[in-house]
Amino acid sequence: MKLLDLRYKLEKGQSLGGEVVYIKEDNLIYGIGSVYKSEDGDSITLLKSKEESVKVNDFINILDNLNSDIGDIEVLIGTDGYTRLNDKEIKSIEFAQYETIKMLFINVQN
């Protein structure tokens, strides 16, 4: 998914009350640990984390900064900062609510 498409969908989820962004793959939920730009500059990779994730507003600000620096490039999901061999594409963004917490899931393409 392109950076601006992801940003638009996160903004839409935020308007529904989404507070935190998570990565969802095979029914497992991960936080977003860090963001890496590829050496050739044609994509960025969100690295999965088992720790807490990031608030939607903060993540939108990160995407805005990346867009102004490197433009509307592909956003991928990865598990490792050293290799991009297993990076996966984003399939969709999903809104969910658990008790009082409203969250957004970045669903990974398998």
Give the residues covered by each predicted segment.
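Detector for the mature cores of small, proteolytically processed
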Residues: 11-110
